[in-house]
């Protein structure tokens, strides 16, 4: 948890001080830029009703932006923590329970067809969620709605 707070603090601190001599690897996404990404993502929908873009990949962690207009397949990451920062829209995070149709992909990554049981947490713009490694989770979106979020994936240690 401390590492997550340090990463989030670093990201927020970076937003305060943007200078020409910023260190290698520094990144700042202004709210106006994220709104532009939010507007573009729905134009590039995949068959699973989602669109995603990698904002930055630093090797051991990465930032992605995702748009969904339908329920996502459940997933689980054995060694990755997901931090979700909702940008727009609304949805529900379903986590825990039993993953039905669970199959391994690679490196401790699991996908399923649905989750039975578990907890449901309504999400909206401005919400931030920490999903621990090893927890089944899925994003649910009501018909006619969408959810867009920035996803920070960091290794669990």
Briefly describe each language-model feature range.
Residues 18-78:
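A short, N-terminal "cap"/entry segment at the start of jelly-roll beta-barrel domains
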Residues 122-127, 133-157:
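Ligand-binding loop in jelly-roll beta-barrel domains
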Residues 75, 82-85, 120-121, 128-129:
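His/acidic/aromatic-lined binding-pocket segments of jelly-roll/cupin-type domains
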Residues 78-98, 105-114:
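Short, conserved beta-strand element in jelly-roll/cupin
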Residues 6-15, 19:
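Bacterial N-terminal signal peptides
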Residues 1-4:
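Positively charged n-region of N-terminal signal peptides that target proteins for export
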């Amino acid at each position: 948890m401390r590492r997550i707070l340090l990463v989030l603090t670093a990201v927020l601190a970076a937003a305060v001080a943007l200078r020409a001599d910023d260190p290698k690897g520094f990144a700042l996404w202004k709210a106006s830029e994220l709104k532009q990404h939010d507007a573009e993502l729905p134009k590039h929908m995949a068959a699973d009703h989602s669109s995603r873009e990698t904002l930055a990949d630093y090797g051991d962690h990465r930032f992605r932006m995702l748009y969904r207009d339908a329920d996502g397949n459940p997933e689980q990451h054995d060694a990755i923590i997901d931090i979700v920062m909702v940008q727009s829209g609304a949805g529900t995070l379903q986590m825990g329970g039993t993953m039905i149709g669970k199959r391994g992909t690679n490196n401790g990554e699991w996908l399923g067809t649905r989750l039975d049981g578990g907890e449901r947490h309504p999400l909206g713009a401005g919400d931030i969620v920490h999903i621990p490694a090893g927890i089944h989770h899925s994003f649910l979106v009501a018909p006619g709605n969408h959810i867009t979020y920035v996803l920070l994936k960091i290794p669990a240690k």
